[in-house]
């Protein structure tokens, strides 16, 4: 019998959650992570599955996700503990044939359940599948320190925030030319914040929750982690710059245009226009 904890997807989740905790982005039970899988990924590990998988209904149907398996972090679980006990802190779930609920196939032992932000994750997966023709498979939410700090001092506007991050580090425009979506402050763990996040995910691979954290989407765990890491590095630079009396020079609009042309990306027009 193959051991599912040695699979690429469990090992990938262990690395991503451990790295995020070491970055200081996921204190206590902060943060959540989901990876969309294929049946072929989990097929070799059926002998590891629960004999009687628990069924949990969704608060709203997700027909586009019908029959789709995911590996997810658990509600109330600490990222720092995933590496110590993957089966207690992670779970593989599979949405049923009509998208009305899901079964917990593996993990989430002792009656644990998936992250409370599962509505936001599933709704965002739904939108990113459409936006990227199925390329994006990962949704990551974390409490990236400097990005959160900037939501207290910058205007919480997509164009403004995006432009500042682009100017904070040259690679940012190349990594997220589609900019950063921003929500108003909302109560977490609700369908409402999930729907608002998913709406922004139609246009952006990064979405900020002011005074709370960030959502990122990408095709792989590495790409998604790297996306957030890049934005957070720029935010860290900006926090230092603002504490040293602000910018005296920066990347100009013309230089941003040249950067986009060099790397074949189309920068968010509203941010470029500022």
UniProtKB/Swiss-Prot annotation:
Its EC number is 4.1.2.19. CDD domains: Aldolase_II (cd00398). Coiled coil: none annotated. Pathway: Carbohydrate degradation; L-rhamnose degradation; glycerone phosphate from L-rhamnose: step 3/3. It is an enzyme of class 4 (lyase). InterPro entries: Aldolase_class_II_sugar_metab, Aldolase_II/adducin_N, Aldolase_II/adducin_N_sf, Rhamnulose-1-P_Aldolase. Signal peptide: none annotated. One of its GO terms (molecular function) is metal ion binding. GO terms for biological process: pentose catabolic process; rhamnose catabolic process. Disulfide bonds: none annotated. It catalyses: L-rhamnulose 1-phosphate = (S)-lactaldehyde + dihydroxyacetone phosphate. Its cofactor is Zn(2+). One of its GO terms (cellular component) is cytosol. Binds 1 zinc ion per subunit. It is found in: Cytoplasm. The active site is at 117. Keywords: Cytoplasm, Lyase, Metal-binding, Rhamnose metabolism, Zinc. Zn(2+) binds at residues 141, 143, 212. Catalyzes the reversible cleavage of L-rhamnulose-1-phosphate to dihydroxyacetone phosphate (DHAP) and L-lactaldehyde. PANTHER family: FUCULOSE PHOSPHATE ALDOLASE, RHAMNULOSE-1-PHOSPHATE ALDOLASE. Homotetramer. Belongs to the aldolase class II family. RhaD subfamily. This is Rhamnulose-1-phosphate aldolase. It comes from Escherichia coli O81 (strain ED1a). The gene is rhaD.
């Amino acid at each position: 019998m193959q051991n599912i904890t040695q699979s690429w997807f469990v090992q990938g989740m262990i690395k991503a959650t451990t790295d995020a905790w070491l970055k200081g982005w996921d204190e206590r039970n902060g943060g959540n992570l989901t990876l969309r899988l294929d049946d072929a990924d989990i097929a070799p590990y059926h002998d590891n599955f629960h004999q009687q998988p628990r069924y949990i209904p969704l608060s709203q149907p997700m027909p586009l996700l019908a029959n789709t398996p995911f590996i997810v972090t658990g509600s109330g679980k600490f990222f720092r503990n995933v590496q110590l006990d993957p089966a207690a802190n992670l779970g593989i779930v599979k949405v049923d044939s009509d998208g009305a609920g899901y079964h917990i196939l593996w993990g989430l032992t002792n009656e644990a359940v998936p992250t409370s932000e599962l509505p936001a994750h599933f709704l965002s997966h739904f939108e990113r599948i459409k936006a990227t023709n199925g390329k994006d498979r990962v949704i990551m939410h974390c409490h990236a320190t400097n990005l959160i700090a900037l939501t207290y001092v910058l205007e919480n506007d997509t164009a403004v925030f995006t432009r500042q991050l682009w100017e904070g580090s040259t690679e940012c425009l190349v990594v997220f030319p589609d900019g950063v979506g921003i929500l108003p402050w909302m109560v977490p763990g609700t369908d409402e914040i999930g729907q608002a996040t998913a709406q922004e995910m139609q246009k952006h691979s990064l979405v900020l929750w002011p005074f709370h954290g960030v959502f990122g989407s990408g095709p792989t765990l590495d790409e998604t982690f790297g996306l957030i890491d890049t934005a957070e590095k720029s935010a860290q630079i900006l926090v230092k710059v603002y504490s040293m009396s602000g910018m005296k020079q920066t990347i100009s609009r013309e230089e941003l245009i040249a950067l986009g042309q060099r790397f074949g990306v189309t920068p968010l027009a509203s941010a470029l226009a500022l």
